[in-house]
Amino acid sequence: MRHGDISSSPDTVGVAVVNYKMPRLHTKEQVLENCRNIAKVIGGVKQGLPGLDLIIFPEYSTHGIMYDKQEMFDTAVSIPGEETAILAEACKKNKVWGVFSLTGEKHEQAKKNPYNTLILVNDKGEIVQKYRKILPWCPIECWYPGDKTYVVDGPKGLKVSLIICDDGNYPEIWRDCAMRGAELIVRCQGYMYPAKEQQIAIVKAMAWANQCYVAVANATGFDGVYSYFGHSSIIGFDGHTLGECGEEENGIQYAQLSVQQIRDARKYDQSQNQLFKLLHRGYSGVFASGDGDKGVAECPFEFYKTWVNDPKKAQENVEKFTRPSVGVAACPVGDLPTK
């Protein structure tokens, strides 16, 4: 893991995160023009950082937030489509991979709300991963939720997963990506004040807990409704920050992520190898007791057992100590039911 140079090497993936200014758009034509601006940014960053292999833009950076529901439907995209063609061509032209936000992606059933989607485009201009946000930021966001994570071979073989904004507040999604083999988890977010300190802290903790690189791209600026705090960052698999932007609009951070180092750590680290130890619980004591050398593999957590085997029951259980309705009468949001 290296930070401070503009290069990369056969073993290191050059990753840049962009503090992109949150746009405020209303039409498809404006979205397409913004796509062309993102393409220009890619070209400029590649010129300045010749080692760049992967560039990452925040959630909502392509469309902005459509606060008008009709505009949200009118600007929703198909994948592939005109918008992705512009972004893919920029990746191909500059020989870089890119992560881009599409808010939203048309639902398969026309009347249902769109998805909040990320795409990973390779340096040939091909879409190699499409991820739909599993945990939309309720009660404000009205995206239809996705239902799974993905892992693909990224630049130089580094294994990459994508997650979006509020997803990252749930340890389960990080662990799911890591346990599927992800070595770099990309979190694109359009996170606003007041939760700045919490969001800076959680990505470091999740990198440490899952022994993985984390790259965060967050929006900056004010869109007339929310103020976005930026702080796009790149975190090492040991939880240390390699590079972090401030609140500046269109700031960029860059680091080189070693493929060999993370694989070496996952193979040879012992006391802090959380991924291995979770599925080999207590192996030292089990071995000393003459019960084999693999530890205990079974899941000890009652909540997860219930969730998998009886999701409705798990939902009822959490409602007992939270609330039974999605809405809150003391602070209603939209037309969400409060009873």
UniProtKB/Swiss-Prot annotation:
Domain of life: Bacteria
PANTHER family attached to this UniProt entry: ALIPHATIC AMIDASE (PTHR43674:SF14), NITRILASE C965.09-RELATED (PTHR43674)
Endpoints of the signal sequence: none
Entry keyword set: Hydrolase
Pfam families xrefs: CN_hydrolase
Active site per the UniProt annotation: E59 (proton acceptor), K133 (proton donor), C165 (nucleophile)
EC number in record: 3.5.1.4
Record-annotated CN hydrolase domain positions: 13-259
Name recorded for this polypeptide: Aliphatic amidase
Family: Belongs to the carbon-nitrogen hydrolase superfamily. Aliphatic amidase family.
PROSITE patterns: CN_HYDROLASE
InterPro entries linked to this entry: Aliph_Amidase/BUP, Aliphatic_amidase, C-N_Hydrolase, C-N_Hydrolase_sf
Organism: Helicobacter acinonychis (strain Sheeba)
UniProt keyword Hydrolase, yes or no: yes
GO molecular function terms noted in the UniProt entry: amidase activity
UniProt function note: Catalyzes the hydrolysis of short-chain aliphatic amides to their corresponding organic acids with release of ammonia.
Record field: catalytic activity: a monocarboxylic acid amide + H2O = a monocarboxylate + NH4(+)
